[in-house]
Swiss-Prot record:
Belongs to the DNA mismatch repair MutS family. GO terms for biological process: mismatch repair. CDD domains: ABC_MutS1 (cd03284). This is DNA mismatch repair protein MutS. Keywords: ATP-binding, DNA damage, DNA repair, DNA-binding, Nucleotide-binding. It comes from Clostridium botulinum (strain Okra / Type B1). InterPro entries: DNA_mismatch_repair_MutS, DNA_mismatch_repair_MutS-lik_N, DNA_mismatch_repair_MutS/MSH, DNA_mismatch_repair_MutS_C, DNA_mismatch_repair_MutS_clamp, DNA_mismatch_repair_MutS_core, DNA_mismatch_repair_MutS_N, DNA_mismatch_repair_MutS_sf. GO terms for cellular component: cytosol.
Length: 932
């Protein structure tokens, strides 16, 4: 038994796209067969059926309606699959034998441009990577906007990973013979990125001609061969998947990695530049604070500014001056912002023009958008700063395009371009004539209905239309005796009516439908001509769109500066960072207004090269260090900064080593990862770099950790080729002695006040080292039971006493008695005041900005609290036997036992942020106040 012709055709098509799920068009459905069907049915939750295919067993099959395909495609692409779309290439009714079919497009994570899949304020990049000896080249494209960027450098894995982190591509195209170890590294760091491989020859083939044909600014002598190969490989892949040359990709932008501030992968994560650490979402990041853009284009551009801060003084100052001018002209700024709100995503609309997928409604959106450009140009003429003057001179008002769209298209056209109702009256004589014929025909139909009602006496008679029978006269069965004989021709019988036609009705039907069909055809042809004209002018619209996005970014920075009382930083060439009353831009937004404690900073490459910060956990050391880095980044993107005064030197790189980061899946411990990160910093930092090191050495034994931290400080300060500006937080108080021995080391600490055996964090960074870590006091604040705290103090006294004798002699404690647990329970609830005053601010200060993600000490305190609560509840009965009821009433007598104790039992505190934990505790406390 042989394969059926259709199945033979399917397998031939499938052979050309083995790495894709094939959507095979059969009538009104896309069908999937064999393994593709099994995968799709699982991922899309479709029923898996079977189809006779000429083999002994039925072929597994599932399908989806073609008109709903985008929803299903988006789900598969989001899961990392590629989809090959196989369409019917001829009219089935006109074909003899099997319908001709072929792949019209391959959809991949990096090339899918459906609006439902794309994030409005984020690019959808696809990247290519080419390696040759010790050099590598990378190209990044967003086919929805037309951006195409390329760069190259000496090959270092860290450099490649940094660029991937910066652009966050959905897909990476590699040469098929590249080392698997490198691919493994990429997948390990970026598990959600799809990897695609192409042959070596696709990077080389017809390279100069391809690039000249695609890019109107390409000069083959300006680019290294390796860069051209990377770009050519990416263009090949785009053409291979889209089956078309995209006219919106018309310019290649080469950038040098060293032209922008380098922020490595770990630093982007630790500083929460564009997403928070915990949920990987925008909220709680620097981007979240700075993004007040009014257009999708501006939102994407601001993200790029933040991902790639500048390192050249002039462009930084140009942006700062423009922001300052906006702040000095609030009325003009508000007018600008109001018009920006009316501008749609010009870049992605013209991207749809290039791919021939734009509809008439989207062109109306384009018309409305470019209609605002003359007003924006007029506003720009009122500014004096260099950046705005240049924008005013360069912006194209696109009035010819606006005029055409306004004259040609209806204000509310059909969604489908193949259903007519697109072209405005007066634009084309033939369209107007056919519309009149169609309208007159329908008037004739209406008059016919009235005439037949009068002649037959059937008041319920109707003249109707459907696509199967055309126009017909419908008469209910109750009135069939009134139907005139000979003139009505029966067409269809229904359960409660009969349908008839007449010769004159069929004659008019042909005229009406002929006019309608012709009208739709002419309107579509006119629409394609309009679309082609716009496509010829894509470059003009893209340039205007970029200027609009820059204006939107500057307005956003001005808005944020005004709302948050930011100041204009001075950019210096002294290799010095001087900040007066600096504030963390994110943390100050998530705590009550006015409660953030500002701090000064002075870091240079001479006397204040390494700022050694000591003090207890939860006191704010990490927040302070991140604050300095974020203020520096803000200054280098051209933003005002949260401070009273800021004098910022341009940094070439920012490195951070903050927080614990086990990589257990890769078999790496906290300490191993920590040392790898420190090694990377010491190898790549320069004298112009800013380095943040937090608790170096804490992942190993005390003396090993102290020795490593000491040695790292010496290396940074004594290595003449390094001497980078450094903030170094530590709990090793022995390191404070280095100020007297190493030039450039300066001791600072977090101010702490002791009141009646309690500590209060003052959040101020002051000159001089801390004399103790207050570890036990922090543990007490975190809610550890009194017996544990008291025992810890005893052990500490023994250890400190035994240090001089070079021995450690501690007698094990007796087993805790029930009364100890009573005290522990009291302490747990009595931490209310401490938790209210400390957790709220301490965890915000010491954790990763607004994500409120607990650090190691906070996790321990939360874990301890959970154990105390469980212990208190489980031992309730035994406690009651040993103590008077009154002595235990403080914990539970004021609580409605069943509801509130159950609520406490079910608290999953380890999966709460500290702020959520505080709010839950506060809620429980309030409930107890309502109980008599």
């Amino acid at each position: 038994m042989g394969l059926t012709p259709m199945m033979r055709q399917y397998l031939e098509v499938k052979e050309s796209c083995k790495d894709c799920i094939l959507f095979f068009r059969l009538g009104d459905f896309y069908e999937m067969f064999f393994e593709d069907a099994k995968v799709a049915s699982k991922e899309l939750e479709l029923v898996l059926t079977g189809r006779d295919c000429g083999l002994e067993e039925r072929a597994p099959m599932c399908g989806i309606p073609y008109h709903a395909a985008n929803t299903y495609i988006g789900r598969l692409v989001s899961a990392g699959y590629k989809i090959a779309i196989c369409e019917q290439l001829e009219d089935p009714s006109a074909s003899k034998g099997i319908v001709k079919r072929g792949i019209i497009k391959i959809i991949t994570p990096g090339t899918y441009t459906d609006s439902s899949f794309l994030e409005e304020n984020k690019n959808n990049y696809i990247m290519s990577f080419y390696l040759d000896d010790n050099m590598c080249a990378m190209s990044f494209a967003d086919i929805s906007t037309g951006e195409f960027n390329s760069t190259h450098s000496n090959f270092k894995e860290a450099v490649v990973l940094d660029e991937i982190s910066k652009f966050a591509p959905r897909e990476i195209v590699l040469e098929e013979n590249i080392k698997e170890s490198f691919i493994h590294t990429i997948k390990e760091r970026f598990p959600n990125i799809s990897i695609s491989k192409i042959k070596e020859e696709n990077f080389d083939y017809n390279i100069d001609n391809n690039l000249k044909e695609q890019f109107n600014n390409f000069n083959e002598n300006e680019y290294e061969t390796i860069v051209k190969k990377s770009a050519n490989g990416l263009l090949y892949y785009i053409f291979h998947t889209q089956k078309n040359i995209l006219s919106n990709i018309n310019k290649i932008d080469y950038y040098s990695i060293v032209d922008y501030l380098t922020i490595d992968v770990n630093s982007r994560r630790n500083l929460e530049i564009t997403e928070n650490l915990r949920e990987k979402t925008k909220k709680g990041s620097l981007l979240w604070v700075l993004d007040k853009t009014n257009t999708a284009m501006g939102g994407r551009q601001l993200r790029r500014w933040i991902e790639q801060p500048l390192i050249n003084k002039n462009p930084i100052e140009n942006r700062l001056n423009a922001v300052e001018e906006l702040l000095n002209n609030i009325s003009l700024q508000e007018d600008l912002k109001e018009d920006l709100k009316s501008i749609y995503d010009i870049e992605r609309i013209v991207g749809k023009v290039a791919s021939k997928s734009v509809n008439a409604k989207e062109l109306i959106s384009l018309k409305c958008s470019i209609g605002k450009v003359p007003y924006i140009k007029k506003y720009l003429s009122n500014f004096k700063s260099d950046l705005f003057l240049n924008m005013e001179q360069c912006i194209d008002t696109l009035e010819d395009i606006h005029k055409l769209l306004d004259k040609a298209l209806l204000d509310n056209p059909s969604l489908s371009v193949k259903e007519g109702n697109i072209i405005k009256e007066g634009f084309n004589e033939e369209v107007d004539s056919l519309r009149e014929a169609k309208s007159n025909g329908k008037k004739w139909i209406a008059s016919l209905e009235q005439k037949e009602k009068e002649e037959t006496g059937i008041k319920s008679l109707k003249v109707s239309y459907n696509k199967v029978f055309g126009y017909f006269i419908e008469i209910t069965k109750a009135n069939l005796n009134l139907v005139p004989e000979g003139r009505y021709i029966r067409k269809q019988t229904l359960s409660n009516a009969e349908r008839y036609i007449t010769p004159e009705l069929k004659e008019m039907e042909e005229k009406i439908l002929g006019a309608e069909e012709k009208l739709i055809d002419i309107e579509y042809k006119l629409f394609t001509k309009i679309r082609d004209f716009i496509e010829e002018n894509i470059d003009r619209m893209q340039k205007t769109a970029r200027i609009i996005s820059d204006i939107d970014c500057l307005c956003s920075l001005a808005t944020v500066a005004l709302e948050n009382n930011y100041i204009k930083p001075n950019i210096n060439a002294k290799n010095e960072i001087l900040i007066e009353e600096g504030r963390h831009p994110v943390v100050e937004k998530v705590i009550p207004k006015g409660e953030f404690i500002s701090n000064d900073s002075l870091i240079d490459t001479k006397e204040n090269q390494l700022i050694l910060i000591t003090g207890p956990n939860m006191a704010g050391k990490s927040t302070y260090m991140r604050q300095v880095a974020l203020i520096t980044i803000m200054a280098q993107i051209g933003s005002f900064v949260p401070a009273k005064k800021a004098n910022i030197s341009i940094c070439d790189k920012i490195f951070t080593r903050i927080g614990a980061s086990d990589d257990l899946a890769a078999g790496k411990s906290t300490f191993m990862v920590e040392m790898w990160e420190v090694s990377n910093i010491l190898k790549n930092a320069t004298s112009k770099s800013l380095v943040l090191l937090d608790e170096v050495g804490r992942g190993t034994s005390t003396y090993d950790g102290l020795s490593i931290a000491w040695s790292v400080i010496e290396y940074i300060c004594n290595n003449k080729n390094l001497r980078c500006k450094t903030l170094f937080a530590t709990h090793y108080h022995e390191l404070t002695k280095l100020e007297d021995n190493i030039e450039g080391v300066k001791n600072y600490s977090v101010s702490v006040s002791e009141l009646e055996n309690e500590i209060v964090f003052l959040r101020k960074i002051i000159r001089g080292g801390a004399d103790q870590s207050y570890g036990i006091e922090v543990a007490k604040l975190a809610g550890l039971p009194s017996p544990v705290i008291n025992r810890a103090k005893e052990i500490l006294q023994h250890i400190e006493g035994d240090k001089e004798e070079n021995s450690l002699n501690i007698t094990p404690s007796k087993e805790y008695k029930s009364k100890d647990y009573i005290e522990a329970s009291k302490d747990t609830l009595n931490t209310k005041n401490n938790l209210e005053s400390e957790i709220k601010h301490d965890t915000l200060s010491e954790t990763n900005a607004a994500t409120i993600v607990e650090d190691e000490s906070t996790k321990e305190h939360l874990s301890s609290n959970k154990k105390q609560i469980n212990c208190r509840i489980n031992d309730e009965k035994s406690i009651k036997k040993e103590v008077a009821v009154d002595s235990f009433q403080i914990n539970f007598e004021y609580i409605k036992r069943d509801k509130i104790i159950e609520e406490i039992k079910n608290i999953d505190i380890l999966n709460m942020t500290p702020m959520e934990g505080f709010n839950k505790l506060y809620d429980i406390i309030n409930k107890t106040k309502d109980i008599d």
